[in-house]
Amino acid sequence: MIPSSLRRLFCLSLLVPMQALAGNTSASSQPALSQELAGRIETLKKKAISDLVFVEGGRFQMGDFGPIHSEEKLPYTSQPENKPLHWVELDSFSLSRHKVTYEDFDVFTDANNKLRIAMAPNDKPYREVPNVPAGLNWPEAKAYCKWLGKLTGLPFDLPTEAQWEYSARNRGQMVLWPTDNGMWEEGRNIAAYDQRKELLPTVKFFSPVTVPLAIFPPSPLGLYDMTGNGSDWVEDWFSEKYYEVSPEKNPRGPVRGKTKVFRGVESDRETGLTFYRQHTEPQKKIRYRDSGEVFTDRWPNIGARCAVQSGRAESP
């Protein structure tokens, strides 16, 4: 019989070469992984710049313009927070043509050694179809846009609420819906219920809240999915009375608040209006009713598109 001390020595003699081999394998594969990630980062960098739409600044009346536009000279909505109609003047800026997708955001999380988002069972169906807008909480949206700024050397950030509405209204015109013709036409420029199920068949038990991007025509400015396909976070804190005190020049919302504004909507005519305001907690924790366990801290239907806070057009 082999003494126990010799058995331990024999096992250790086998273990050391095996550990060395595993270490060498990992080391040899790491450069390939880094090279692959570097390629994805470079591709995203080029995409982020080429995706920009330059929006020339100007002056417009922000808010529910029904009293000066509708036949009855009445507001289009009963919402108090999108009133009063007030003048706003904006400097020029650029806005992303498309929303951030899960593929885009995966590059950000991988590059920063973070866990990928939306890996829960309820979220995964949206990942299984390419080019679907990512559901993000506000801190994630903000961090992603600022990271693009570090990546490109450009002042990327979230758009302000005023910038978003000005863009949705084709530089402040009296446009009701930010579609190709200013109309809400389900099946032609907005996804109808049956189309949503067809475009995202991985979602089995309910109508998808988002669908792949750029299925329908862009707005006259060249912006896709400003309504009818999820919402966009903006920079501003929310205040119901902000329009009463908003500065005219480049407003950025209240200094502080409890909820953040998001604009656009997935499938509703009224909330899809260019001037309709919505807000929610920046990082809402959604819990299981029975256990109280948090299963997500983001809404699948609120995402982001980034802006470049610069007065000149950017090119790749």
List PLM regions with ranges.
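Extended beta-strand/loop cores of jelly-roll/beta-sandwich
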Residues: I2-L6, C11, A20-A162, R171, ...
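Functional-site microenvironments in short loops/helix caps that host divalent-cation chemistry
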Residues: V55, Q61, G66-S70, N122-D123, ...
